[in-house]
Amino acid sequence: MSRSPDKLALPPPPPPPPSRTVVVALSGSSKSKYVVTWAIEKFATEGNVGFKLLHIHPMITSVPTPMGNAIPISEVRDDVVTAYRQEILWQSEEMLKPYTKLFVRRKVAVEVLVIESDNVAAAIAEEVTRDSIDRIVIGGSSRSFFSRKADICSVISALMPNFCTVYVVSKGKLSCVRPSDSDGNATIREDGSERTNSSSGSSGPTSDSSDVMSSAHDSQSRPLSLPVRRMQHFPAIAGQASVPMETSSVGSDETRCMSLDAEEARDVSSINRSSTDTTSRWTPRRRDYEERKEAMSSSSSNREYGNFGTRFSWSGMGVDTTHSRASQQASNMSDALSEQSYTDNQVNLNFEVEKLRAELRHVQEMYAVAQTETFDASRKLGELNQRRLEEAIKLEELKLKEYEARELAEKEKQNFEKARRDAESMRERAEREIAQRREAERKSARDTKEKEKLEGTLGSPQLQYQHFAWEEIMAATSSFSEELKIGMGAYGAVYKCNLHHTTAVVKVLQSAENQLSKQFQQELEILSKIRHPHLVLLLGACPEQGALVYEYMENGSLEDRLFQVNNSPPLPWFERFRIAWEVAAALVFLHKSKPKPIIHRDLKPANILLDHNFVSKVGDVGLSTMVQVDPLSTKFTIYKQTSPVGTLCYIDPEYQRTGRISSKSDIYSFGMILLQLLTAKPAIALTHFVESAMDSNDEFLKILDQKAGNWPIEETRELAALALCCTELRGKDRPDLKDQILPALENLKKVAEKARNSFSGVSTQPPTHFICPLLKDVMNEPCVAADGYTYDRHAIEEWLKEHNTSPMTDSPLHSKNLLPNYTLYTAIMEWRSTR
């Protein structure tokens, strides 16, 4: 009863191990790829063949240091030496990876072996002998026709065991082959041609003789550029005597692996053509010798002989040979070897003659080159003589010009004397002017010292603000009562309070987020160091709780006034012109601040506050950034890779696209504010709306805020055009704030002041920040005290003579130093000049 076969499929058996292994020795140079490619094409098609990539690197005797020196390994810790060896091994494996991939793509088994040795040839020979490798492929070096020094491939071939065939590859082609002694026939292929070398002995019963021949060949050279002739030993015929046989070889160990690439093949072919006569003389002898050798080989295949016997028998016949016949055969073989030795010596002589002829041709070529160079030198000498004549002509022309120049110099000398007399009279007048300027210079020096002192104080890293206790703020805001809450900012609520008998505003940041803490530090750092009439004044802070105390602005924000929140009266057009100039002046101050410019980054009508006299001040600098100036640009450009920060419709499009922030970003926001001052409309699509109306005066008048009064059409169109230039998409197309925008707004401000004076019918009242808190009048010499408030110098000095506290906060003053407020002084002077 038969059983059905098992339906379960057995896993495929593992691939059998390679039956033969081919070693490919690589140096890691750019030519190693050709060696690997040749080995794959040659042996991968034979079937179950494995490959072993062999690389030799020098022995590690020292470890390099970062200073470029080397320390012997005997003076280094073992773990450092081990790590360095692993690093060298890893580098070798990484170097061999591209060659390994060539085998993987051909789906051929490959093994990588890295050996550490100072003797490359000996290491390769030892590896081949230990694993009994019968085939090895090495790369051949490029050699000159006149080179007589043995290269590395010759040394490797000489050290290889007899059972291993050595293939030398040069330029992607087989250069030469050193066959093993076990090969019956050795075929060398050179650019499509074949040369077959047959051993004179036969296989079969003459294996002992072949072993003896192998030992003889181990000490003889094998010139692979000529056909290889190998002879086997024959045993002694009579008594204990034997006939010694030596293999004739052409060349020495140094020419053992002579390269047969394309160039050298042409040289050898020329040698063969030049030695045709010589070859014709020994060709018949060689043919006769080959016939006799073949007869001897056929007869020796039927012999049987002992270790040292003096007779032998023919197989199949049983006939004993006599001593005379053995002597005759030995004599014939001796004649054949002598004739062959003569023939080989003749070939070597012809080869050396051709070398000398090639050297002679080289010398002749060098002589021709020397003749050419001599001719060129003669030609150049003629050119130099011609140039010398031309230079002589130019020299004569220069002499003529020199004479003319002397005459001209004489005339100039006369003119100089006249000018000198005029200068004497001017010097006398200048001395009188110097006497008049000395007093002005003394005053200027005093002002410069005070300014330097102010700059040093403002540039100090110490924060200059009033420190309020958290309990004081809690009490002033009635524990942050909702009744005192006047607004909600992007980062916290805003409360109105009364601190130290002063109406103020407290802004408390939500400290739960790290970003808010960073925003608080930025705002505190900037506001504590700057003072400007059109920047919101920082009265103090409570850093522990993230609270900032500002001056109170009675008329709220510009946004509330433009959109008439809580039925507030509209701003007349001349007030809007003035506000535009004040905001621009504040931006110029921020952008030109030292040592680092300040970019606001969130400029909008909601962040522009108005006091009781409608004087505008820029606030909410929480998003401001102090940045470094690009030293390669005259107009500073700041690169700050960050996500866009600010308010939609006011953010610079270039900043949104590239993340690069600069002063041009604030100019874009300022342009949007100018458009809103003109139209009192939301910022969305406002630029397109105004551009469409600029072509017609009627359309332009329709888009203006009619509640602002009768706009002067020419000045208003000028302001609208300036606003559109500020809102260009590319920053480089926008005007400069200090050199272009501010001068234009100053002209418009003068027009607005004239209109305001005529509208009110009375003289302009001074802004509140021009008023000294002590004198209740306009300050003549404003100075900043240690409490952060500005006073008239004479009034505060009189106060400090009797008090050590602040007139505004009643808190102790840590210093009685006064800093001149030059910015406010300039504003007061301008205000007085317009009255």
From Swiss-Prot:
Pfam families, A to Z: PK_Tyr_Ser-Thr, U-box, Usp
BP GO terms, sorted: protein ubiquitination
Family assignment from sequence similarity: Belongs to the protein kinase superfamily. Ser/Thr protein kinase family.
Compositionally biased residues, Pro residues: 10-19
Location of the Protein kinase domain: 480-745
Keyword field: ATP-binding, Coiled coil, Kinase, Nucleotide-binding, Serine/threonine-protein kinase, Transferase, Ubl conjugation pathway
Catalytic activity of the protein: L-seryl-[protein] + ATP = O-phospho-L-seryl-[protein] + ADP + H(+); L-threonyl-[protein] + ATP = O-phospho-L-threonyl-[protein] + ADP + H(+); S-ubiquitinyl-[E2 ubiquitin-conjugating enzyme]-L-cysteine + [acceptor protein]-L-lysine = [E2 ubiquitin-conjugating enzyme]-L-cysteine + N(6)-ubiquitinyl-[acceptor protein]-L-lysine
Biased composition (Low complexity): 195-218
Domain U-box, residue spans: 765-835
Active site: D602
Name listed for the protein in its UniProt record: U-box domain-containing protein 35
Organism the protein comes from: Arabidopsis thaliana
Annotated segments matching region Disordered: 1-22, 177-303, 410-457
InterPro entries per UniProt: Kinase-like_dom_sf, Prot_kinase_dom, Protein_kinase_ATP_BS, Rossmann-like_a/b/a_fold, Ser-Thr/Tyr_kinase_cat_dom, Ser/Thr_kinase_AS, U-box_ubiquitin_ligases, Ubox_domain
Lineage: Eukaryota, Viridiplantae, Streptophyta, Embryophyta, Tracheophyta
